[in-house]
């Protein structure tokens, strides 16, 4: 029996936008896609925000998109996951966080919360700190101190004072907590082994050395008056009655509420590593130290509140378990996406998984060669479809995204037209072997190349919907509206007449006519 391949085709960065201006997808000549949308089941799918496990309204990206697709479930990114746990109440049952509270109560010691105080959502979120304060109140911890690292990169450069004032209002409302120190992220969150900076922040936290102040908002204002905005605020110790409010000492608990690891590692090592080499520590308090996420396996003496979610039974694993063959095809720029990210962050290929890599062209920017390597990628796809070797083929065309990032409209139009031709060749090959295909995108990009408010070039991703098209499948099916990327693989599994595994919580898009 010959194999009838099922193809998942991802047009990277190919969104749908009602506006025509600066819309390369609309301005390009796309006879193939136009025909497919007219003749086959076609709906708009969601590829941004909560639909892909990101905060509401946040644009999607390729890593998140491919991970959601391959997992067949919404994969919550750390920010959303922690926020969701606070809302659901699971946060308040977290074992590592409860252990930090318990340690302080048993030793009549303090709990210190440190981290980036902003709503930037890149490294941390201030609502997560508010959740910790609420937890401390519920658990009856009395000595609670906050060490504020000020942002000014993922938020406006002089917004820190407002965040400090909002924190003070929140602590008053909850009924627990005092601000002990404020430091710019330049010092507390270095990631380039500039230990002299980290040392200043660490000393403020552990010895009470640094600039002195009696009121946190006033201390931040004084820094502004000195032409040092949030990021560069010198480590400042807030004093009460001439003494530091809350120095981190033996038997205390420390919770570092940043969830992104890269800028959290260095100061964490200063607290946790026995063989720390960064600088001579004036104080080495022995504390219960809890990191929000696992910043690094090699950091010693730490606990982790939110472990990385291991994804079991991704599409690749599922196919391998059913002794089915699969091909992953992409050019260099998107090769990791159809392999590592599609497999849930796992590098090793599955049994029966062939990986076909086409090199991306060596040009300074892709507007200089908007075709990129799409013709060669298409050739490999057609060969794979006709090879009688594969049950499933996952293919990515990088052009609309990579050329869209240049913001050059003519080039982006050419990129979209190139991909349209490739889709046409794939459909022809597919019909010859009576295969079926699902066409989608991982997020938008090429459909918006200008900022509609300012008229300036727009080179980022978008929150626009993406096309979902079902090609040459059983004609009794159409597609439902309001689907998301996590629903695609459950759709393919149903098309192949197989049983959806329990781990996949996405829902098939198929509807019988």
Predicted regions and their residues:
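Feature captures the catalytic ectodomains and active-site-proximal regions of enzymes
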Residues: 1-513
């Amino acid at each position: 029996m010959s194999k009838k391949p099922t193809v998942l085709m991802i047009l990277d960065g190919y969104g749908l936008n009602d506006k025509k201006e600066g819309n390369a997808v609309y301005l390009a000549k796309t006879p193939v896609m136009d025909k497919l949308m007219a003749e086959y089941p076609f709906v708009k799918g969601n590829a941004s925000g909560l639909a892909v496990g990101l905060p509401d309204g946040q644009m999607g990206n390729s890593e998140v998109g491919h991970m959601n697709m391959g997992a067949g479930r919404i994969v919550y990114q750390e920010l959303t996951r922690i926020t969701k746990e606070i809302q659901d109440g699971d946060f308040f049952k977290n074992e590592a966080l409860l252990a930090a509270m318990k340690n302080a109560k048993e030793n009549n010691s303090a709990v210190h919360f440190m981290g980036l105080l902003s709503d930037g959502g890149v490294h941390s979120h201030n609502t997560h700190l508010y959740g910790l304060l609420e937890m401390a109140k519920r658990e009856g911890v009395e000595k609670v101190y906050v060490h504020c690292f000020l942002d000014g990169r993922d938020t406006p450069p002089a917004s820190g004072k407002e965040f400090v004032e909002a924190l003070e209002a929140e602590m008053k409302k909850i009924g627990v907590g005092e601000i002990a120190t404020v430091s710019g992220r330049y010092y507390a969150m270095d990631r380039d082994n500039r230990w002299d900076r980290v040392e200043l922040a660490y000393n403020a936290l552990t010895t009470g050395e640094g600039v002195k102040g009696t009121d946190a908002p006033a201390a931040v204002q004084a820094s502004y008056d000195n032409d040092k905005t949030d990021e560069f605020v010198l480590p400042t110790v807030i004093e009460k009655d001439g003494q530091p409010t809350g120095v981190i000492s033996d038997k205390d608990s420390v919770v570092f509420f940043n969830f992104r690891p890269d800028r959290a590692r260095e100061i964490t090592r200063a607290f946790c590593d026995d063989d720390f080499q960064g600088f001579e520590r004036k104080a080495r308090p022995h504390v219960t130290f809890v990191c929000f996420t696992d910043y690094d396996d090699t950091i010693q003496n730490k606990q982790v509140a939110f472990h990385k979610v291991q994804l079991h039974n991704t599409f690749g694993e599922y196919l391998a378990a059913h002794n089915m063959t699969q091909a992953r095809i992409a050019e260099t720029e998107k090769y990791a996406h159809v392999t590592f990210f599609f497999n849930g962050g796992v590098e090793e290929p599955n049994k029966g998984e062939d990986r076909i890599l086409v090199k991306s062209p060596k040009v300074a920017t892709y507007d200089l060669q908007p075709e990129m390597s799409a013709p060669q990628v298409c050739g490999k796809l057609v060969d794979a479809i006709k090879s009688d070797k594969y049950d499933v083929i996952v293919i990515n065309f990088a052009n609309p995204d990579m050329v869209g990032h240049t913001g050059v409209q003519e080039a982006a139009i050419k990129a979209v037209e190139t991909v349209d031709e490739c889709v046409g060749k794939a459909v022809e090959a597919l019909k010859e072997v009576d295969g079926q295909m699902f066409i989608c995108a991982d997020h938008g990009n090429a459909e918006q190349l200008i900022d509609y408010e300012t008229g300036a070039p727009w080179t980022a991703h978008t929150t626009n919907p993406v096309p979902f098209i079902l090609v040459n499948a059983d004609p009794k099916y159409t597609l439902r509206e309001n689907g998301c990327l996590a629903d695609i693989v459950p759709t393919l599994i149903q098309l192949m007449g197989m049983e959806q595994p329990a781990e996949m919580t996405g829902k098939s898009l198929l509807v019988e006519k």
